[in-house]
Amino acid sequence: MKKLDRSNSDDAKLCALLKESLLNEKEAYDYVQKTMAYNSNFIDGNFLTFEQVESLYNTGSISTREGSMQAKSLAEIQGHFSAFNYLVGTLDEPLSEEIIKAFHYCLKTKNHLNKSPVGEYKKFVNIVGEMQTVSPVEVSTEVKELLERYSKEKVDLDSLVDFHTEFEMIHAFHDGTGVIGRLILFREALRNDICPFI
């Protein structure tokens, strides 16, 4: 598979076309919205099928013959739809703590079962797998330092991977950090003419 080269005018045109399509063509926007919501939430353990996500997006409801469905799964997908709308509306702004916290607010505000702060950094220590994450009192400082370093870098695929890795290691939120990290990757790829990935 050919690697995209941003210095190549054909590749730059392709990335610009993808961004333009996402912003101006409902069909492209709808496809990315549904596919990204499904894939990103599936990675985090959401059990909805793509067809159920598509139905929720298109009609606001899901009919199921498979039995019960968790309210949390529905709320997470609906939250992702809101976060993606917010993402598209902020493409002209540099990445900031406010945008990151707004992603979390969009993702988690519809989940009435969520007992953690919504739109705010974590208040309690958490462990991801066997990895110790940053303590709650250090999160804001660590995120600010990460954003400051990132703002000074030439953004390419490698710097996006580095940013995502550091963001995951900080693990700024009690729940939803992985989904937010993937939203950031998609957003920053679009902002920097890097073909986005879903």
Ranges and model annotations:
Residues 1-198:
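FIC/Doc superfamily catalytic core
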